[in-house]
Amino acid sequence: MRTKKAFLLLTFNVLIYLAACQETERILANNGTEDNEITTSKGVSPNTNPLFLSNSTAGLYDSKGRIRLTIGHIGAIGALRNDVKILEVSHKALQAEGILDDDLDVEIISQTGCGESYEGVAVAADMYHLQKVKAFIGPYCNAEMDAVARMAAFWNIPIIGYMAASNNLADKNAYPTLARISLRTTNSIAEATCAMLRHYGWNKVAIITNTGILAYDRVLSFEEVFHQRGINVVKKIMFDEFADSKAMIASGLLNDIKNSARIVVCLFSNTRESSREFLTAANTQGMNVNEYGYVFPWLQDGGKDASPWTGADGSMLQKVKDQYANAIIIDDVNSFDNTIVGPFIERIKDVGLTEADVDIANIYGYLYLFDALKLYAIAARKVLNETGKAENLLNGRMMWQNMRKLKFVGMVGASGIASGQVSMDDRAERAPLYRGFFVSPNSDSVLPMVHMEPTMLDNCDGIANKSGCYEIVVTDIMRDFWPSVDRKMPKDEPDCGYRNERCDYTLIIIGAALILLFIVAAVSAFFAQKILEKRALDKLPFRIYRDDLQFIDEEQLKSMLSLGSTRTKMSNMNYGSRNHAIVGTNTHAIYHKYVQRRPIVFNRADKTLIQLMKAAVHDNINPFLGMVWNEREEMLLVWKFCSRGTLQDIIYNESIQLDTKFHGAFIRDILAGLEYLHASQIGYHGSLTPWSCLIDRNWMIKLTDYGIADPLERWEKSQSISRDGLTSDDDKSQATQATSILYESPEMLKNREKNRVRRVDQDWMRQTQTRRQLGDVYAFGLVMYEIIFRALPFPEGTNQSELVEWLRDGSKVVKPTIPQNKVLNMDLSALIQDCWNTTPEMRPSLRRIKLNVETYLNIKGSLVDQMTRMMEQYANNLEKLVAERTGMLEEANQRADRLLSQLLPAYVANELKLGRPVPPKTFTSSTVLFSDIVGFTEMCQNASPLEVVAVLNGIFDGFDQFIARKDAYKVETIGDAYMVVSGVPEENGHRHINEIASIALDVHKFLSEFIVPHKRDTKVQCRLGFHTGPVAAAVVGLNAPRYCLFGDTVNMASRMESNSEPGKTQISETAKNLLLKEYPDYICEQRGEIPIKGKGLCMTYWLMGTKSEGSGRSGAYLAPSMKSAGTGFTGMLGNSANDYSLNLKNPTGLQR
C-alpha cells in the first residue's frame, strides 16, 4: 500500500510538472514565429498531446549530424561500486564489435536512486525533461522500477531492467516498453522450479514462507506458475518474518507438513537465514529423512550472498551444512563455483579496474548492467538498419519489439560460460537458464543434479498468452543419487497415505504377531536352557565362588610365611608376590587368573575331566581345589599352595647345592606322579614343565596343571579367555607360556598348529590318550636333563627367544641334544635321548624309565634324611661364621671407643653411648689454662701450609703426651691456641691448681728443646696464662658434639694468656693464693697491677718454677727474670743432644 500511495502522489506531481513544461515550450515557440501568431486548439490528438509524445528529436544528432543517443542509468545508493566503469567497458566492446560507430553512438548519464524517498523516480523525470535521455537502464530496485517503467511507457521510450526481479514487471500490458536482462527474476526461477517438479513427477507440494510483502509477492508468483503448469499446492504455511527454529517448532505448524506433503518448496524473504532456521527446526522434529524433499529456489535481492554454510572468513561450517543435507537448491548454473570471476576480472582490466575495485559478491549485477547496454545498442542498430529512420529510435514500443527473441553473447559469454549467453524470450525477458543442486551429506561441495535450459516455441504470441513462448527442457546430470535404499527420488505422497489410510496391515500384523511369538518362545527356551545349565554348573563339585576366596596381599603373605617355626628362608622363595588366597577356612591356595571375554561353556568331556582332576589324590599330585568362572570377567584356576616353590626355583638357585640324592628323589617323585596320572581316568599330564612341579615343605615333588591344557587351549581359541591377566610373577604368565613350547613334543606342536588355523566352528582335533602319554615322556626327558645339569639340552649360547620362535613357526628344526662336555652315565644318557625320539612309538615307557633311573642314580633312603644332614652341616658352618663376625664387631667397638674418648671426656662419652643425656653441670673449683704460640702469623707467612701444619702437629702432639699423664683435659685447639682444664669433668679437690701449674712449666721446658724442622735456628715461644674459679660445662650440638666450658673463669684465664709475655706464664691473684697455700714449693713473682678488659686493674703474678728445680736439679726450668726476658724466637737456642726434632714422615709423632 505504501508503494502504491507513493506512486500515485509522485505521478500526480510529475503530470503537473510535465504540463507546465509543455506549456512553457509552446509559448516560447509561438513568440519565436515570424508573425507572432498564437495557435490554439480545442482538442488535442494523441499524436500531438505532450502527454503521449516522446521528447522531440532535438538532441538526437550531434553537431556533425551523427546520431547520439543519451541513455540514463539509474543505479542504487551504496550498490555496485564503479558501475559507470562497467558501462564504459560495455561501450568499448560495442564499438569494437561495430554495433556502435560514427553514425550511431550513445552517451550515458548515470545517477543513483533506490533510497527511502523514491529518489529514482525524480531522477528519471529530471533525466527525461532536462537531460533529454532517450532510454533508461534501471532503476536497480523493484519499487522504483515499477514507477519509472510506467513513466517510460507513458513517454514511449525503452527501459531495460537489470536487477529488478518482481514478477509484476513481466506484465507487458502494464509495462509495454520494459525489457529485463536479469537471469534471476522471480517468474523465471518459478518456471524453472515448476519444470524440475514435473520432471520428477512431483505434482503435490507444500509452500513454506513467512510474513512480509516481499515473501507475499514471491508466493503469488510461484502459485500462479504452479497453477498454470498443473502443480497442486496442498498446503501453504506462513511463519513470522523473523522467526527462529525454536519459534517455528513452538508454532506446531511443522506437524501440518507431516500430515499433508512430502515435497516442500521454501520461499522466504531472507532466503539464506530463514532457510537455515527452518531446516534446523525440521531436523529437530525428525523431518530431514529420505522421504522428504526440500526445494529452495534461491531468491535474493541485490547481490548474491554466500552459501549458508560458508562462514565470514570463507571456511565451511560443517554443522550448518549438515542441516542442509538432502536439500535441493535451484539457482544459476554457475552459482556454486567461481568460473565467471576470472573472465570478469579480465574484462574490467580494460578500464583500469581490479578485483578490489568492485563488489565481487554482486558480480551478477555488473554482468547484467553490461548486458543491458548491449541489448539496447543491438536493438537500436537493428531498428536503424531495418527502417533507416532515426526517429524510430525514439519509439519505445518499436525498440521493445526488436528486443524480443534476441540472442547475443554477454560479458563473459566469450569464455564459454553458459550463463554468459543471453537469450531473450517473446516478452523481451531473459529466458531462464538454471540448474538444480543437491546438497550431499557425503561431499564438501554441492552436486549439480539437473540442468534446465529453455527452448523457444514457434507460432507463439507471448503478449496474448502471457508467457515467454519457451519450454524448459530438464536434463539429468546425476541419476540414482538420493540417499535412500533404492536410490530413487522420494514420492510427493506416501503410498499408504499420510495416515496409512490406504494400506491394509492385517496380514502384516498377523505375520508380525507370529514372528514375535516365535521370538518370545525362542528367547524363553534360550533363557530356560541357561537357567538349567547354571543350576547344573552350580552343583558341580569343582565350582568355587569368588566370594568364597579371601585374597592375600604381599604383606599378609609375609606374615603367614613367618609364623611356622619349621619354615626356612627357602620356604617363601619367589612366592612373595604371587597370587595367593585362602579357600574356605584355612586352605592356603594359589590361583592362575585369566581374563574372561565370553561366558565359558563346558561340554560333557570338560565336566568329566575337571571332576576327575578334583578327585585326584596322590602323594605326588598337587590337589586341584576348583575353578572360578563367569564372574567379574575373569577365570581362576585354584590349586593348593606348596611352600617351597617350583622345581625351576630350586634348579636355578645357585645358593642351593644339589647332589645325586636330590636328583634321584626329584626324578623318582615326578615318575610316581606321572604313573598315577597315566593309570587314572585323567590319562595324561599334558603340560609337564619344571614350573608345573611344586615342592612342599617336606621337599616332595607334587605335579600341578595336569589335564587342563586342552580345555585352556580351546577356550583361548574361541576367545572365551585371554592370558593378558597373567602377571609376570605368575608361573603361568605369557613369558612362561612362551617358553613352555620347548617341552612339547614335535607331534603336539603340529597338532596345535592345525588347531590354530582351524575355524571356530570346526571340530577340535584331539590327540589320542596314548599320544598324550608319549608326549609326557618327551617332556620328562627334558625335565630330567634339567634337574641333572641345571640347564636346557641345547648348545651353549643358544638364544632362547629365537629358539621359541623357530619352534612356533616351524622355520627351523631344533632337537635337544646332550653336549659332549656334559659327563653322564652312558646308559642314562641313552635313556634321556630315547625320551626325545621324534617317533613317539620309539619312546620308552614309564616303567622302563623308572627301573633304569633307580639303577643308574642309586636312589636309597629318603630326601628328608639328606636334608637333615645338610642342615646340621649348615648349622656348624653358621656357628663358626657367627664367632668370626662377633670378634670383628668387638674390635670395631674398641676402635670406636678409643676415638670417642679422644673427642670427649670418658664420663661424657660413656653417658652418650648409653643413650643418656648429659645435662650441663657447674664445678665450684677448677683451673683453666690458655696458651698461644708467639709469632705464629709471621711463621705462616714465611712457610708453606704443609710446613705450618707439621710444626703445629709436632708442638701439640708433645703437649698431648704430657697432658695425658696429668689429671687434666684438653678442651680444644683453635689454630695455634690450646686450652686445658683440670677439675673438670671429674672434680679433684684443690689438686687442679697443681696439675695446671706443672703443665705450664712442662710446656716451657718442652718448647725450649723443640726444633722447627724447616728453620732449625728458630726457637718457638708461647704465652701462657691460667686462672682458678668456678665453671659450667656442657655438651653442645647433636651432630659432632663438643664438650665446652662457660663462665667468668674461662674469660679471666683467656685474659691472663693474652696479657702475658713470650716464654712466661701469667696467673691471677686467686690462682697464686691457692697455689702457694696448697703447694708452697712453687715460686711466684709479683708482676704488679695491669689493666684487664672487663675487670679494670688486677694484680697478676709470674709463675717462675719450683723450689726443688731451682736448687740445681739437672734440667730444671726456671723462668727468666723480667729484665732478661726475650720476645722472639732467638732468645732460647738448644744445642743439647737431647733436642727434639720433628719427623716429617710422621708429623704427629716425636722422636728423640
UniProtKB/Swiss-Prot annotation:
Q: Which reaction does it catalyse?
A: GTP = 3',5'-cyclic GMP + diphosphate
Describe the effect of C141S.
Answer: Reduced basal guanylate cyclase activity and reduced chloride sensitivity
Which top EC class applies here? Answer: lyase
Per the record, the domain comment is:
The protein kinase domain is predicted to be catalytically inactive. Might be required for the negative regulation of the guanylate cyclase domain. The guanylate cyclase domain is required for thermotaxis responses.
What does UniProt note about where in the body, tissue by tissue, this protein is expressed? Expressed bilaterally in AFD sensory neurons.
* Mechanisms controlling activity: Inhibited by chloride with an IC(50) of 60 mM.
Where are the annotated coiled coils located? 861-899
This protein's name: Receptor-type guanylate cyclase gcy-8
Quote any Pfam family the record assigns: PK_Tyr_Ser-Thr
Q: Which residues lie on this side of the membrane: Extracellular?
A: 22-506
Query: EC number(s) for this protein?
Result: 4.6.1.2
- The Protein kinase domain covers 567-857
| Species of the source | Caenorhabditis elegans
Tell me the compartments it is located in.
Answer: Cell membrane; Cell projection, Cilium
